[in-house]
Amino acid sequence: MKVHEYQAKEILRRYGVPTPRGIVVDNSEEARRAATELGGRVVVKAQIHAGGRGKGGGVKLAKDADEAAELTQKMLGMTLITHQTGPEGRVVGKVLIEEALNIDKELYLGITLDRRLGMNVIMASAQGGMDIEEVAERDPNAIHREPVDGVLGVQPFQARQVAYALGLEGDAFKKCVDFVQKLMRAYIETDAALAEINPLLVTKEGDVLALDCKMSFDDNAMFRHKDVMAMRDFNEEDPLEVEASKFGLNYIKLDGNVGCMVNGAGLAMATMDIAKLAGGEPANFLDVGGGASAEQVKNAFRIILSDKNVKAILINIFGGIMRGDRIAEGVVSASREVGLPVPVVVRLEGTNVELGKEILAKSGLPLITADGMWDAAQKVVAAAKGHQ
């Protein structure tokens, strides 16, 4: 789960992580009052769940309260397009008015899980204020990585290593060490999946602050954090993904035209790969799980069909806990309820597979059956091309 910049900073402040003073607004008059309260010279920042806002025109410097109000009026309601939003962009509903600071250095600091190491890793670079992916590609050695033991936590010497890597000294060095330790505590205690400070700002006065902050959280841990869960902004999420989550379905919308319904994340990814190999483009990732009911299958079917880009659907089920007859009943029920506006290819294997195939055969529906994954992939790609 993602949160907005102003929400991430609110979380960080609870842990003593320094951030600039800021006020979130949703109209120009509030922006005028906020800018006046913050001293007049402020930064106006569009709040969307995506990076690259500056390049897209979503971050502007205002010299006084009147200009802040004018910029806010222009930003609110605009569709902001960045390299992370895709061509459809995101509509701006809130704006953060933040005090302007005297910048000396812009650095990068981030914490995330390194699955290869099985440890959280602190990443730091003196090349802040830009996409860290670009830095990693251009100059991998410019990023310092500090793995953190899950039991011991971040040690003082590790925080000092990070400050050294950022080239800091004097008061800024000491403040950075404190910043790193507090950021790690915030990351761990909120079950975050990412805490990214870009840029980490060093002011001319020697202060160290989070000028921008991006945080995301482990969905499976949110039952422990009702306060963070309350920050969820459904307007920033794909409506189909929100709908799927209500039924316990793991759904991620993609840009292709081959809808996929699969049980198990590994098989779902393999199904997407083989559809791509056969010349198709997956329209989604959808894992119905190991114990889905016929009702869940029906809802999964309906959600896939809600995507107007879908030209054919591949249902690929290996029955272990999930029985083939239950899937078949769900497919038949969903097909009769919503109709079959696109071709549907079904591949069943495992528990009760023969019973499942029998249910499909007796349904009288124009379902296309397949004997293996490659056969299914070829059939669904051909069906999608024929249904353009």
Give the residues covered by each predicted segment:
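Catalytic core of bacterial c-di-GMP phosphodiesterases, primarily the EAL and HD-GYP domains
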Residues: 320
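Short internal beta-strands
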Residues: 341-350
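ATP-dependent carboxylate/acyl-activation modules
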Residues: 1-197, 201-315, 325-327, 336, ...
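Short amphipathic alpha-helix used as the core "switch/output" element in two-component signaling
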Residues: 332-333
